[in-house]
């Protein structure tokens, strides 16, 4: 509720008003190769970054994030972690473990916990493996482990859902109009959300490397540009840039 809305409520004699609750969101990262970012790496390990990144973004959507310990690649560990997170939250967001490999346990964990699976793939790049399910009537969002894929799928599919849980009527992503500094093409069969920067004059530039593991180009970007499948956007084209910081 904004200050202006509070003033209007007071001026019209409304002492109490119904509001949507801020949802509690549990964040679970899976992967035996992951290490907490507070220690030292062992051979074959990488620091886990998705929980902190996504928790920060969820706070902008009025979520109340709780970060749970990293889960090793085993079905029993995944089931236990998800059960713990669901007991304490209104929704759970996992990262990693949503593909079809031997070490991907999120989908079988949903089944073991008596949940339902709505879908598990989306036609976007980055971010093809994405799980939407329910356990005990609460939503589970299973995001890819690659950081850029996790951010893109969060923005496109999780953020609107979190807002809807609070009764919000405006669920769309904020965009800024701009024009392309250089031509961009998408030769694939999925929508490609390219990391870009948009400056104060509205000039839109790709951040170069677009691999789903490249956090450096993500850190430089302030927006995403949706390029349809098998299409090319010419230099100077008028475009709408999805703002990342929302």
In which residue ranges do the predicted regions lie?
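Short, glycine/charged-enriched hinge/interface segments at domain edges or termini
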Residues: 1-72, 224, 243-246
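Short beta-strand segments
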Residues: 27-30, 94-95, 123, 143-144
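A general structural motif
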Residues: 46-51, 71-77, 120-129
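N-terminal small/polar loop signature for handling phosphorylated ligands or for N-terminal nucleophile
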Residues: 55-105, 109-114
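Flexible glycine/proline-rich
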Residues: 109-246
